Amino acid sequence: MEGESAETEPLIQSSSAADRPDPAAEAAARFTVYRRRWFILSVLCLLNCSNAMAWLTFAPVAGQSAQLLCVSLPLVNWLSLVFVLAAVVCSFSSMWVLDTLGLRCSLIGSSWLNACGCVLRVCGVLSVTPQWAVFAVVMCGQTLCALAQPLVIFAPTKLAALWFPDHQRATANMLASMANTVGLLLANLLSPLIVSYSGDLFLLLLIYSIPAAVACLLATLGIHQAVPPTPASASSSSSASEPFLQGIRQLLRNRAYWILLLCFGSGIGIFTCFSTLLEQILCVKGYSNGFAGVCGAVSIVCGVAGAFLLSLYVDRSKKFMEVMKICMCLTSVSCSAFAVVSQLPAQSVLLVLVCCCFGLFGYSVYPVGMELSVETTHPLGEATSAGLIFTSGQIQAALYLLLLQALATPTHSPTSVCAADTSLNWTVPVLVMAGVCAISSCVFVVFFHTEYRRLRAEADSATEPEPTGDAADA
């Protein structure tokens, strides 16, 4: 690229000429890493965080939102459920956009959807908006944000594969993926504070629209290329080499990927249930909403910290399967402990510790699992392999939520601090949740085996020394 200087690494030729199908790729072929990859990663992190905040804007203040929007509580819940619906409905189109039209188109398009949705939500609560139209306008804005979510959620593996060298891919994936979790944490903390301070939704929605607008501006003006001028690694040049529909068919014939799809997707579904039902499970045993929020926040913080450490480790060791299997086993143990401790009153310290372990081993393995999906399916599109797993998790989450709520029975516990007529006995549901988690972990540990196809392809085509510097972008 003109105007750019770069420190590059020579591509070491294979001993067999047949291994090099392109005769023009001679010893002059080189790999380059560009400093702008960190800018694109930062934009994706901000966009992912902003979209997660939009998703969970109303859930922590559902009661106040129902009053201020003049609607019922079930309608307020749909402001969050629309994200789950959009993730399932738009998953295949989002995968196609990422793997066919490219990363730049996906990030700019999703940033505009997210920003327009956030701004439309603000317009919905303005005083000039008729009362009968308030909820409809807010829901339209929320739907636009929801349509952006699959493009944002599926992007980290694509960005890591295209722009980052092999020793930084898991870390880049972790940073982009965990930004979504940080957004959920911020929404849990900020929504109650802002609404209690202002007494309305205008200030809340206005503040949440700022990071969305900034991400849109940065993506539109700052991202100029879908791929780097020179590949960052041997595998990035073959990313998404298969047509989309042909890639889907190949995925469905991959036994190891099916196991990962179902077992890892089950883990995503379990954690969605945990986050959604935590307050309802704890209130019946006398734990306040504030304490439930602390438990949720602790699990997220520990998960982010664990993801950072695990990503650094697998970037260097490449032990994706070992890390996944160990963490899934420890997650099932933590889930079983939560099923027992959550049914005991006056065990605050122990409950926080269990939630800490649950988040540490469960949340932290998400970026590693997404990288493992790419290793299992290379050279198929990264967005397709990771996107199908996320979609599987959303579908299983919906099924588990319906099952667990059906198993919960009304109760009249003397320790309950739940709202009137909402106390439920969650003993059987949490045991079922722990059982599902344990079964998924056992199946994954026993039956999942795969070769690291992307690493093998890179080893076959080149031996790349660790870059000594980044390209200086013009």
Curated annotation (Swiss-Prot):
* Disulphide-bridged cysteine pairs: none
Per the record, its GO cellular-component terms are: membrane
**Chain segments carrying region Disordered:** 1-20
Q: Which UniProt keywords apply?
A: Membrane, Transmembrane, Transmembrane helix, Transport
Q: Which SUPFAM superfamilies match?
A: MFS general substrate transporter
Q: Name one GO molecular function term.
A: transmembrane transporter activity
Protein's membrane topology: Multi-pass membrane protein
The answer to whether keyword Transferase applies is no
What's the domain of life for this entry? Eukaryota
Q: Does this UniProt record's set of keywords contain rRNA-binding?
A: no
Q: Where in the cell is it found?
A: Membrane
Indicate the transmembrane segments per the record: 38-58, 69-89, 105-126, 134-154, 175-195, 201-221, 258-278, 290-310, 326-346, 349-369, 388-408, 428-448
Similarity comment text for this entry: Belongs to the major facilitator superfamily.
Q: What is this protein called?
A: Solute carrier family 49 member A3
The UniProt gene name for this protein comes to: slc49a3
